[in-house]
Amino acid sequence: MSSSLWLQCLQRLQEELPSAEFSMWVRPLQAELNDNTLTLFAPNRFVLDWVRDKYLNSINSLLNEFCGGDIPTLRFEVGSKPISAPPRPQRTAADVAAATSAPAQMQARQSLHKPWESRGPEPVDDLNHRSNVNPKHKFTNFVEGKSNQLGLAAARQVSDNPGTAYNPLFLYGGTGLGKTHLLQAVGNAILERKPNAKVVYMHSERFVQDMVKALQNNAIEEFKCYYRSVDALLIDDIQFFANKERSQEEFFHTFNALLEGNQQIILTSDRYPKEINGVEDRLKSRFGWGLTVAIEPPELETRVAILMKKAEDHQIHLADEVAFFIAKRLRSNVRELEGALNRVVANANFTGRAITIDFVREALRDLLALQEKLVTIDNIQKTVAEYYKIKMADLLSKRRSRSVARPRQLAMALSKELTNHSLPEIGDAFGGRDHTTVLHACRKIAQLREESHDIKEDYSNLIRTLSS
């Protein structure tokens, strides 16, 4: 009874939730039904709290639908069911194909439950153990928002359960969005709990350089020994492996060895794994074996929170209206925000003036002028039309077909977010539409970004293109 009931719930939740969200929070749950009480077992307290906070109503609603009036009491526990493994939703044809294409060793690896601990032997010669983890990058000073919430949660889970939670963890997104911060925060969290752990952070180019040096020195076995003995390997900008065939070959075998040993791998890239050109398909396939999470450009509230946090680090007072002024005009990434604030703070220190909106406008005049020049309604319209492969004339027309109406709504929402034009001005630019039409479009897109993974992804891609 418990298996079939929870299986029904799983199948429905899998249909309703984005795949990454389902894989991270719902799939790990195990279920047991005793005396009309359905107990859901979560792997740790973090998952338990998240599921109870985010999905309790949905689960109760499904139980009501599937059980009629005889609804079991729902309770949560940290741990695992004492008997068989949790039920899984029925696999699709794509799932089966992916599973059968994976090598047998991957299936064997998934059945291993080795304790996570430091592995020897010690590295030799100039491949001395170096973590390279920046101690300043921690979870405590990472500003959370909707744009990075899933990535932060995944990183925390990996740091709590390295080698078992999500392996590999693949974070992707544009420059300056916090991927490196999260990567190193995991490393710091692991080292805080296990100071002797072999945690190695590096840019992908360093892996290539180490391999080349090992080949030159006839020390490739030492190179393999070093990289395959780490407890956690954190590699930034994996896209730089593109077209480096020997490096990809060596990393392929290192990757397999680490996964078989339940050693944690975390990778970052500026794009989705399958979109990385010049990297072998077998590697791209493995990048997706664990959990793949997008880190998106921060929304307005998160940008403001980042500015306030950085101002606090500088020990200066930043008025709310000043933070909003900067955040509304600089939207592309966190690094740009930090650079702008650093310039404002430096100017204030040099001149002794108070940080007001007028002062910020003066200190950042070239940067703000460039942003206003780059992001115009016309530019947004052209970018959206090109992205969806429709004609500009159709985008501005009265046509209501879905293939045109949705891109038009997206373009209106982007115009509202990325420019300082009023709703009537935006409506005017879209064929003389009323401001209420623009308002409806903005609300509709905001709703769809919550409900549709595709719309959310398209919106993020367009923001990235327009802000680059």
UniProtKB/Swiss-Prot annotation:
The keyword Cytoplasm applies. It comes from the Bacteria. One of its GO terms (cellular component) is plasma membrane. PROSITE patterns: DNAA. One of its GO terms (molecular function) is ATP hydrolysis activity. Residues 114-129 have a biased composition (Basic and acidic residues). Residues 1-84 are annotated as: Domain I, interacts with DnaA modulators. Residues 132-348 are annotated as: Domain III, AAA+ region. Keywords: ATP-binding, Cytoplasm, DNA replication, DNA-binding, Lipid-binding, Nucleotide-binding. Its main location: cytoplasm. Oligomerizes as a right-handed, spiral filament on DNA at oriC. PANTHER family: CHROMOSOMAL REPLICATION INITIATOR PROTEIN DNAA (PTHR30050:SF2). Domain I is involved in oligomerization and binding regulators, domain II is flexibile and of varying length in different bacteria, domain III forms the AAA+ region, while domain IV binds dsDNA. Plays an essential role in the initiation and regulation of chromosomal replication. ATP-DnaA binds to the origin of replication (oriC) to initiate formation of the DNA replication initiation complex once per cell cycle. Binds the DnaA box (a 9 base pair repeat at the origin) and separates the double-stranded (ds)DNA. Forms a right-handed helical filament on oriC DNA; dsDNA binds to the exterior of the filament while single-stranded (ss)DNA is stabiized in the filament's interior. HAMAP family: DnaA_bact. Belongs to the DnaA family. This is Chromosomal replication initiator protein DnaA. It comes from Aliivibrio salmonicida (strain LFI1238). The lineage of its organism: Bacteria, Pseudomonadati, Pseudomonadota, Gammaproteobacteria, Vibrionales. The gene is dnaA.
